[in-house]
C-alpha cells in the first residue's frame, strides 16, 4: 500500500468508529462490537502507516508544506539567549590549601560487650 492509501484507510476507519461509538452510547450492542473490531483494524493500519512514513522520510518522498517550512524558518531566526559563564577565580595558595584540608573526624570508641555470668544448674540429688 502507498502512504496516501494507508492514510485514507485510517481516516475512513476513524469516521466509522466515530459513527458506531455514537450508536453504542445509545445502547446498540452490534455497534459496540463493530467499534472493537474496527479499533483493532485501525491499530494494525497505524502500524503499517508508521513503517511507510519512516520509509518515505528516508527516501525523501515526504515534503514539507510551505506553511510548515515558513514556521521552521521563523523559529530558527529567534535569538538564542547566551548563558553567562562565571569564571572561577584562580586559586591562591591559601584558599586552595584550606579547601583541600579536611578535618579528621573523631572515631567513636568500639563498643565492648558486657559479659554476663553463666548460670549453672544445681545438681542436688
UniProtKB/Swiss-Prot annotation:
Which keywords does this chain's UniProt record carry?
A: DNA-binding, Repeat
Region (Disordered) residue ranges read 98-125
**Pfam hit, one:** Hc1
- The residue ranges flagged as biased composition, category Basic residues, are 100-125
Q: Which domain of life is it from?
A: Bacteria
Q: Name one GO molecular function term.
A: DNA binding
Q: Which family is annotated?
A: Belongs to the histone H1/H5 family. HCT subfamily.
Primary role: Might have a role analogous to that of eukaryotic histone proteins.
Q: Please give the name of this protein.
A: Histone H1-like protein Hc1
Q: What is the species listed in this Swiss-Prot or TrEMBL entry?
A: Chlamydia trachomatis serovar L2 (strain ATCC VR-902B / DSM 19102 / 434/Bu)
Amino acid at each position: 500500500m502507498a502512504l496516501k492509501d494507508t492514510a485514507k484507510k485510517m481516516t475512513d476507519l476513524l469516521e466509522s468508529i466515530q459513527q458506531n461509538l455514537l450508536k453504542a452510547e445509545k445502547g446498540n450492542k452490534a455497534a459496540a462490537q463493530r467499534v472493537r473490531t474496527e479499533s483493532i483494524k485501525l491499530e494494525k493500519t497505524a502500524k503499517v502507516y508508521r513503517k511507510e512514513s519512516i520509509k518515505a522520510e528516508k527516501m525523501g518522498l515526504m515534503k514539507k508544506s510551505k506553511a510548515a517550512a515558513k514556521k521552521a524558518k521563523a523559529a530558527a531566526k529567534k535569538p538564542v539567549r547566551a548563558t553567562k559563564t562565571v569564571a572561577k577565580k584562580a586559586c591562591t595558595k591559601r584558599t586552595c590549601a584550606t579547601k583541600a584540608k579536611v578535618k579528621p573526624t573523631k572515631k567513636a570508641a568500639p563498643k565492648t560487650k558486657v559479659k554476663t555470668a553463666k548460670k549453672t544448674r544445681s545438681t542436688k540429688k
